[in-house]
Amino acid sequence: MKTWEKNIRRVEPYVPGEQPKVKDVVKLNTNENPYPPTPKVHEAAERMNISDLRLYPDPEVTDLVHAIAAYYGMNDNQVFVGVGSDDVLSMCFLTFFNSDKPILFPNISYSFYSVWADLYRIPYEKQPLDKDFNIIPEDYYKGNGGVVFPNPNAPTALYMELDKVEDIIKHNQDVVVIVDEAYIDFGGKSAMELVNKYENVLVVQTFSKSRSMAGMRIGYCFGNPELIKALNDVKFSFNSYTMNRTSISYGIESVNDKEYFEECVGKIVKTRENAKERLSQLGFSFPDSKANFIFATHKSVPAKEIFEKLKEKNIFVRYFNQPLIDNYLRITIGTDEQMEKLYAALEEITGQVK
């Protein structure tokens, strides 16, 4: 082995959901929003002066930060914006998890957590969920170097009540606690109100799910000004211009259109509740989803078999080939039309064609 090969930092990378190259598919595998962004984004695109692209964007993302802060009733210095919530979370890991003690997160959770920990050489311990896939707050009361968990959790879609979230924070006031709320808009109460109560809390959200902007890559978090300043210091040490002009412009229009946002979320929640009934009738069981997806297992047909047969029909869902969840499928909530195609295919695959 060459000397330079020995010095390569090797990690097991995160594996994203498949992005089919063909167009005629039912894509229910990456928890994207099935509806387009607010029409105001299209209007912003038409107004954009292409000549301005020769100029660097605002490194402090001032206008978008202000729009987000105003929408949620926070101060500008309590908001950090990044290139998707993955970028925000990665910066959080790098900035705040520098102890010799292990950070704690669930064993069935967002798999990027362990990737970042390995990349940044952060020790970590995965905490088991209970038999029903619930996070056990007491497991996070021990000494640690930080805590991070999604709420609702992914891929289980289970929401943990805010009083339990606060219990975890209360027992960890000497470290930073990150609540990853990528799916919070589809059910449950945000931990955002705890930001002004506890100085060690960061609440991370995204435009990728409820705001139909996965292609723009906009994420953000709320925290006390000292935490936000530390994040910006680290961000500027990597790249001063992380957000491009189009992302900033479209993000502002998206966050300002509350009516359209609530309409889209309402449609997804309605379709999700119908999906619970339809999937149950087809022999599936699942935790009670508060996200824009359902984590389902069938009573007789293996998940991998269903996954493969759906793919043959150009219907894409997510299968996780890992212990404890290898007989589950994560099914994104699509439009009613997409879901009807899914149900028809599942009726055939599970032998329940009427």
What does each model-found stretch correspond to?
Residues 62-102, 300:
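Phosphate-binding glycine-rich loop
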Residues 269, 281-313:
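Conserved PLP-binding catalytic core of the aspartate aminotransferase-like
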Residues 163, 309-318, 322-354:
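PLP-dependent enzyme catalytic core of the Aspartate aminotransferase-like
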Residues 1-55, 143:
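N-terminal "arm"/small-domain region of PLP-dependent enzymes with the aminotransferase-like
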Residues 125, 130-185:
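Active-site phosphate-binding strand-loop segment of PLP-dependent enzymes
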Residues 95-116:
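Conserved PLP-anchoring active-site segment centered on the Schiff-base-forming lysine
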Residues 60, 200-280, 284-287:
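PLP-dependent aminotransferase class I/II
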